[in-house]
């Protein structure tokens, strides 16, 4: 039995089709001065062909997944046509006298590797998109045929080293019952599209392509993270029963999507979605998100060769605000640094990047970046209910400085006769012990708090969650972290304000009742977690969850907390 990473839940039974992709090997070959123009033309012709293909895929994607998913390939086309990318490739061809193919591979691979260094899974997985674009461009430069999944005419479970977003967009559910890959993660566009298709998928198995051969019969059970090769009749029958139970459970959860998260004794909780771009809105709305609890704007800055302009940002924020139809959209300003690098910004190499020049610290030092982003957010606020969220705040002075900047920009926009929400709400991320400890001072300066449990846990426990030697110590259910969360929530309520949570803990089913009992006002999570969290809240008594919270807050160890959570009966 083989396992991997859940990309999209479900069960599939079928024969294997191995999708083999040969790596394109480009041997170093210097070109003559006379051939430079020829190679540059090869690049332009390859790009033109790639844009045409991606435009066709974009249209087909819109028809299959809905208009919102077209944005994935609009992004691909934008990167292909990016002036900085073009300039870098042409400069390499001209100055180093290398072929268009070699120059393209060098530049694209550099961008992909920069993204892979990022610990944030969502941004890290954008490397797959960059390589997808680069591979297409490279093949078109070299006149190599591109894989077309539309040619599959038998029912199969597709197995490959990886699947790119453009390949996933070609999946025909009539013939492709599910897919498994060696590479990939849960937040890649491939996984996101698989969830939109509701097709069973497991990624990140490392070596599934070496464990199976064509026509092997397999069971792909992504519910239990199991891949069973050539199973017995008994196992097939057992898994068929699991499939039936899952189908009925899924249908019941669908009914909850558009219901409110109201406890059995009438306490209402707001449930939101964390997103990275416009394509995620479709899944958020489909799963019943009442708001966007976190819009990670970093994605706008990644996978490109220059900072996004104010207008580019404005269009992105405006589209999301309009798509949410006046439901709250909390836009976090750029959270770059730490493990999120932007090659074109030449960020310094630091010994402790997570304790260094990152997030709001960069924005405050680079006022042109801050101003462009805040102006874009303010302008977009005329088209929906937008809130501003500042990350990595550790002092009252920072907030006051930022509020002055917002006010200055509001005056600017008025002079330019541009419309915006003059009463726009401003909040801060609580993701350091410093901000949690002085929450009583910070809350007087803002409208709301949003707890980022990923960084709060890391900083509170002094544990680098990306360090395999100590990652076992990273535990958001640690008594110290739970105490800080409770303190922050209570302080916000004392001042008549509210606290949300956008870290991974918000979507963790084990602690839903605990967070509810601690008084958390808003849970924001991955869209696919929303129906299940709503189900738990709707079955829970608020008063009983408060009793649970009181007991948990007295616990001295994580084990004691988990024991209390496991014993709690809804």
UniProtKB/Swiss-Prot annotation:
Cofactor needs: Mg(2+)
Main localization (coarse): cytoplasm
Keywords: Cytoplasm, Kinase, Magnesium, Metal-binding, Phosphotransferase system, Sugar transport, Transferase, Transport
A Gene Ontology term for the protein's cellular component: cytoplasm
Cell compartments where the protein resides: Cytoplasm
Entry's EC annotation: 2.7.3.9
GO BP, sorted A to Z: phosphoenolpyruvate-dependent sugar phosphotransferase system
Enzyme class: transferase
Binding residues annotated for phosphoenolpyruvate, in chain numbering: 296, 332, 454-455, 465
Active site: 189, 502
GO molecular function: kinase activity; metal ion binding; phosphoenolpyruvate-protein phosphotransferase activity
Pfam families xrefs: PEP-utilisers_N, PEP-utilizers, PEP-utilizers_C
Substrates-to-products reaction catalysed: L-histidyl-[protein] + phosphoenolpyruvate = N(pros)-phospho-L-histidyl-[protein] + pyruvate
Entry binding sites for Mg(2+): 431, 455
Note on domains (UniProt): The N-terminal domain contains the HPr binding site, the central domain the pyrophosphate/phosphate carrier histidine, and the C-terminal domain the pyruvate binding site.
Subunit and interaction comment: Homodimer.
NCBIfam families to which the protein is assigned, alphabetical: PRK11177.1, PTS_I_fam
Protein task: General (non sugar-specific) component of the phosphoenolpyruvate-dependent sugar phosphotransferase system (sugar PTS). This major carbohydrate active-transport system catalyzes the phosphorylation of incoming sugar substrates concomitantly with their translocation across the cell membrane. Enzyme I transfers the phosphoryl group from phosphoenolpyruvate (PEP) to the phosphoryl carrier protein (HPr).
Family that this chain belongs to: Belongs to the PEP-utilizing enzyme family.
Note: The reaction takes place in three steps, mediated by a phosphocarrier histidine residue located on the surface of the central domain. The two first partial reactions are catalyzed at an active site located on the N-terminal domain, and the third partial reaction is catalyzed at an active site located on the C-terminal domain. For catalytic turnover, the central domain swivels from the concave surface of the N-terminal domain to that of the C-terminal domain.
PANTHER family in the cross-refs: PHOSPHOENOLPYRUVATE-PROTEIN PHOSPHOTRANSFERASE
Protein name: Phosphoenolpyruvate-protein phosphotransferase
Originating species: Buchnera aphidicola subsp. Schizaphis graminum (strain Sg)
Gene, per the UniProt record: ptsI
